[in-house]
């Protein structure tokens, strides 16, 4: 059981490492600042600033040697939002008076009431009939003490078999 768990962990870790095999050498950052940018802060308009240091040494032999140190340069882009203000006002006034006359019509319906008298009465229903019930068949055996004894013996045998099986496990 422990071996199979270890095998699954190894397979899962190889799967994760296979998906994560990317390398990064440089990166670009875009910063969006609301409003106008302050004067003289950082680089503007996507210019690139190299933070490395360059040393130039000239030997007595006349050859020139150049050493460059520093990290991979970072490119920073600052995007300032542009705001446009436009005010447009249009006033149009139009007044038209329209009169509509509606005629009221009233319809009167006559009320009609119908009175039904309550009816009371008694009803008697009698059903009589004659017939014959016929059929053939056999009646099953009744539960006897022999059947109960066989069931008890079967249960005891199953219990004994269960106990013997537990001894060998």
Swiss-Prot record:
Gene from which this protein is expressed: PGA22
Q: Which residues belong to the signal peptide in this entry?
A: 1-18
What's this protein's function? Putative adhesin which may be involved in cell adhesion and virulence.
Which one GO biological process term can you cite for this protein?
cell adhesion
Q: Does the keyword Iron apply?
A: no
For membrane topology, the record states:
Lipid-anchor; GPI-anchor
Keyword list (alphabetical) reads: Cell adhesion, Cell membrane, Glycoprotein, GPI-anchor, Lipoprotein, Membrane, Signal, Virulence
Lipid anchor positions (GPI-anchor amidated glycine): 140
Q: What is its main location?
A: membrane
One Gene Ontology cellular component term attached to this UniProt record is:
plasma membrane
The domain of life is Eukaryota
Q: Localized where?
A: Cell membrane
Instruction: Tell me what this protein is called.
Output: Probable GPI-anchored adhesin-like protein PGA22
Does the record bear Signal in its keywords? yes
Q: Which residues are glycosylated?
A: 87, 104, 111, 118
Q: What's the source species' lineage?
A: Eukaryota, Fungi, Dikarya, Ascomycota, Saccharomycotina
The stated induction of this gene product is: Up-regulated upon milbemycins A3 oxim derivative (A3Ox) treatment.
Q: Which residues form the propeptide?
A: 141-169
């Amino acid at each position: 059981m422990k071996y199979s768990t270890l095998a699954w962990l190894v397979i899962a870790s190889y799967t994760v490492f296979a998906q994560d095999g990317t390398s990064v050498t440089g990166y670009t950052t875009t910063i969006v600042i609301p409003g106008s940018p302050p004067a003289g802060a950082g680089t503007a308009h996507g210019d690139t600033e190299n933070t490395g240091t360059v040393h130039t040494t000239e030997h007595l032999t006349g050859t020139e040697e150049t050493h460059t140190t520093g990290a991979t340069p970072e490119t920073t882009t600052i995007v300032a939002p542009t705001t446009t203000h436009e005010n447009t006002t249009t006033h149009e006034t139009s007044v038209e008076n329209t009169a509509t006359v509606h005629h009221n019509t009233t319809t009167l319906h006559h009320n009609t009431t119908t009175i039904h008298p309550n009816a009371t009465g008694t009803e008697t229903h009698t059903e009589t009939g004659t017939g014959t019930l016929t059929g053939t068949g056999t009646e099953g055996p009744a539960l006897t003490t022999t059947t109960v004894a066989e069931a008890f013996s079967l249960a005891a045998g199953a219990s004994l078999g269960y106990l013997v099986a537990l001894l060998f496990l």
